[in-house]
């Protein structure tokens, strides 16, 4: 679709309403006026290489709430606004080289929003931009409760924490 709103039929076809017509959790997270209070995204552009950058800790920050579509769009916009774009001249044009590939930021943020653990109250997805890196934090650990440090990475199978969201 091309907007932030969904038609009623879409809610039914993607199992985002129950048999009584009430939104499921996935439906509520995708609704334009998301009723889920902890569907939030915190974004910060830090001054330096860590969260204590000297005289000024943060150069920019924003807190967004609303549907996952809104959070995704606002998060990508925040990163684009706060990253550097270098460029070099060629014989007949200019090549722009942004710090981060927009498609990669989009994909990482989609994964963070879709696969986060929404049962952890008082938590939110974070985007932190430093002078040398971008980090995206998503609440929740491994779906089976193990620690990733204790696992053989080659044997971890793909598991979707929120399958309805992942299907959409």
Model-derived regions, located:
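Active-site helix-to-loop segments that bind/position phosphate- or nucleotide-bearing substrates
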Residues: 1-164, 168
């Amino acid at each position: 679709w091309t907007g932030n709103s969904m038609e009623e039929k879409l809610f039914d076809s993607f199992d985002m309403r129950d048999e009584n017509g009430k939104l499921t959790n996935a439906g509520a997270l995708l609704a334009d006026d998301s009723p889920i209070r902890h569907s939030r995204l915190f974004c910060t552009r830090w001054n330096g290489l860590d969260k204590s950058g000297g005289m000024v800790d943060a150069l920019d920050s924003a807190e967004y709430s609303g549907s996952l579509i809104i959070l995704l769009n606002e998060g990508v916009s925040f990163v684009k606004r706060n990253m550097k774009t270098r460029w070099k001249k060629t014989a007949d044009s200019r090549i722009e080289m942004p710090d981060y590939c927009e498609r990669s930021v989009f994909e990482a943020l989609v994964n963070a929003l879709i696969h986060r653990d929404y049962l952890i109250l008082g938590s939110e997805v974070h985007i932190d931009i430093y002078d040398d890196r971008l980090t995206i934090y998503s609440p929740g650990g491994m779906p089976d409760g193990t620690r990733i440090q204790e696992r053989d990475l080659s044997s971890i199978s793909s598991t979707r924490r929120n399958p309805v969201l992942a299907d959409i």
